Amino acid sequence: MDEELRSLTERLRQEAGGSAAYEHLVATRDPGELAEVLTAPGQPLWARELAAFRLGLAGDRRAFESLVLLLNHRDPPRCVGAAYALARLGDPRTARAAAALATNELRVAYALHPVRLLVELRAPESVPALITTLERRLRPHDPYRRVALACVEGLGTLGDVRARPVLTEALAHPALAEAAVDALARIPKSG
């Protein structure tokens, strides 16, 4: 069993109170049954999350919308699981959705996992979204340093020369300076 799946199933087992419905969802091999959980009324969040995660790992695109909603959830473990499944889903809409979540100023408190997902995806949307998000985080007294740091580290990982100006700006921020130096060192010299 995949380590991320093991962690998620253990967390959801506790949430579900070890119910028979939980055990059935963990055991079923029927993707149609899992997809039905995503749309059936009255399903608990743990059931929808488990079904979406399992479908995502199987590459079943019916999980996409549910996983995107979970990626933007206020509970970080749900975001982590959704990002993991979305990275393996293979849906071409994933990068656009992650970029939209990462750059949404109304939901910036929940942008950490969309930012990390963009780095993992290495999609055309990744660098522009990370640059935009980081530019906004460089404002004075911005409270979202973890998001800013993830952007700096991600831009270094992606190694795109378009990130050089914003990373240079990040050098002036003590909480980001060391990571910005490392990120800039990973970006090829332009010109």
PLM region spans:
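Residue-level detector of extended alpha-helical repeat arrays and alpha-solenoid scaffolds
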Residues: 18, 48, 79, 95, ...
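Core register positions within helices of long alpha-helical scaffolds
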Residues: 21-25, 54, 85-88, 117, ...
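Non-membrane alpha-helical segments in proteins
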Residues: 19-20, 45-57, 80-85
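Short inter-helical turns and helix N-cap capping residues of alpha-solenoid HEAT/ARM repeat scaffolds
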Residues: 42-44, 74-75, 106-107, 144, ...
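Amphipathic alpha-helical scaffolding segments comprising HEAT/armadillo-like alpha-solenoid repeats
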Residues: 2-8, 26-40, 60-72, 91-104, ...
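Extended alpha-helical scaffolding segments
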Residues: 144-169
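Conserved hydrophobic register position within alpha-solenoid helical repeats
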Residues: 18-22, 51, 82, 114, ...
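A contiguous pocket-lining binding segment that forms or flanks enzyme active sites
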Residues: 107-116, 120
